[in-house]
Amino acid sequence: RVHHSKESAVYHDPCELGRGNNIYKEPRELLNKVVNLQSVSQEAELGLCCGNSLGGVQLNAVQRDLIRIDALNVLQKNNPNYIATACPLCKKTFVKSAETDVKDIAEIIWLSMQNSRKPKFVHEIKQPKEEAVIEL
């Protein structure tokens, strides 16, 4: 079971998952069940590259940094609690300079599941039985 949090998130569309496999709707449906998902100006087919994708192997470090900073400016504009992504490389790239907590979708769902657990109360603490010691 999951718990819907009052926290907010934006979703970064990873290049391969989105443009490569046309998966845009499903990650948002999942996130909407557990956080308040905010829209960003460039998402889905218009989503921004993280700056470190496999398609950017021809770019130098400065170019990759500029792409990352541009994407983070868009994603952090409305001060969400989380930037969510479904790509470990995008997460690793954004964590370098994000002011917002960057998490994989699975981490956000897991946190929601942890928050939905009912507390367990221990009515009685049983002491362990003393073991008999046999001397030889």
Model segments located where?
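Iron-sulfur cluster-binding electron-transfer modules in prokaryotic oxidoreductases
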Residues: 1-136
